[in-house]
Design a protein with these regions (language model features):
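Switch/communication elements of ASCE P-loop NTPase nucleotide-binding domains
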Residues: 1-26, 179-308, 314
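Phosphate-coordinating catalytic segments in nucleotide- and nucleic-acid-processing enzymes
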Residues: 19-210, 298-308, 317-321
Length: 321
């Protein structure tokens, strides 16, 4: 949660980049300009805790690829009795590893060994044509059951029976009473923007649930009815659905969504002053469990409300025009 320009998107992109490092042991510096960033990543693997430290540096000979410098890895056996000490340096012992890797490959390779996609980032800024192809790719090439695909289509348009990609240029859209072969451009005129984004969102969500992966969404409420957003959150909360422990990480301006959660320690407040700062609702604020979290936001207990004075300044400027 946080105001506009409070750093929420930057934080989610940082989380995505951490997942990329863990999953592929390398990282490209695209639009984030993260060269010079120092990272400390704590993670669990094969009954042990690891703390990884590095500084990301961009080198001209590596193109967009970042090099990993000043790398150190620390390890600790994991016991439930240590759960409150996970971020305490004193429980860790440094691993001495001989580095024999290219500069753009992290020494995490020696620990995790296999590449894996640990998280999906839902990007609704993509071209809608790209979103359609991406959604169908998730369905067809990542083992998503046909019945799940049809349920998703019905969820956003109950007249659609099926949607198939014939080739990279052609789709077959089947309604209750007819089928049509359409180019991607023609298909975009048949489906609403919300339907396309919803199909892409739910297909990626099911993929994350099936794999037990992370699923990252910036501004989860964008373009969707409140009920659909609540349904998506409930799928990740329900252990009967989320059998592999998939993790939903999202930002929102819609504070009523927070009332869906019984706990406070999974809610973070983002603020941007000289730097982006995250505070935890449970740890850093006094929040009574018997009060709606949304009410606390409306009362501006966390300093996240839109400035009334700024709104009035705009209104007065318009009145005086």
């Amino acid at each position: 949660m946080g105001k506009n320009a409070s750093g929420k998107t930057s934080l989610l992109k940082l989380i995505e980049n951490v997942y990329r490092i863990l999953g592929s042991f390398q990282l490209e510096d695209e639009l984030m300009s993260i060269s010079g960033t120092q990272l400390e990543i704590t993670f669990y693997h094969e009954n042990r805790l690891f703390r990884y430290e590095t500084e990301l540096v961009r080198q001209n000979n590596l193109g967009k690829n970042l090099s990993f410098t000043q790398e150190r890895i620390f390890v600790s056996d994991y016991f439930k009795s240590k759960s409150k000490l996970i971020f305490s340096p004193e429980i860790y012992t440094e691993l001495k590893l001989k580095r024999e890797l290219p500069d753009n490959i992290s020494i995490l390779f020696y620990i995790l060994k296999e590449r894996k996609n640990y998280a999906y980032y839902y990007d609704d800024l993509k071209d809608q044509d790209d979103m359609l192809h991406a959604a169908y790719d998730f369905y067809k090439n990542h083992g998503i059951n046909k019945k799940y695909w049809k349920h998703i289509l019905h969820l956003f348009d109950d007249n659609i029976m099926d949607l198939e990609e014939i080739n990279s240029e052609l789709f077959r859209l089947t309604y209750l009473d007819r089928s049509m072969d359409l180019s991607a451009k023609e298909l975009l005129t048949m489906l609403s923007s919300g339907t396309i984004k919803g199909i892409a969102l739910y297909t990626a969500a099911i993929q994350a649930l099936q794999e037990g992966s992370g699923f990252i969404i910036d501004e989860i409420e964008n373009h969707f009815h409140k009920t659909l957003v609540e349904n998506l959150i409930s799928m990740f909360k329900d252990k009967a659905v989320n059998k592999k422990g998939a993790v939903l990480i999202f930002s929102t301006h819609y504070c009523e969504l927070l009332d869906l959660f019984g706990r406070n320690d999974n809610i973070w407040i983002s603020k941007s002053e000289k730097q982006i700062i995250l505070t935890n609702m449970y740890r850093d604020y006094s929040v009574r469990n018997d009060l709606l979290k949304s009410r606390k936001f409306y009362d501006d207990n966390f300093g996240t409300a839109v400035s009334y004075e700024m709104l009035m300044n705009l209104k007065r400027a318009l009145m005086n025009e």
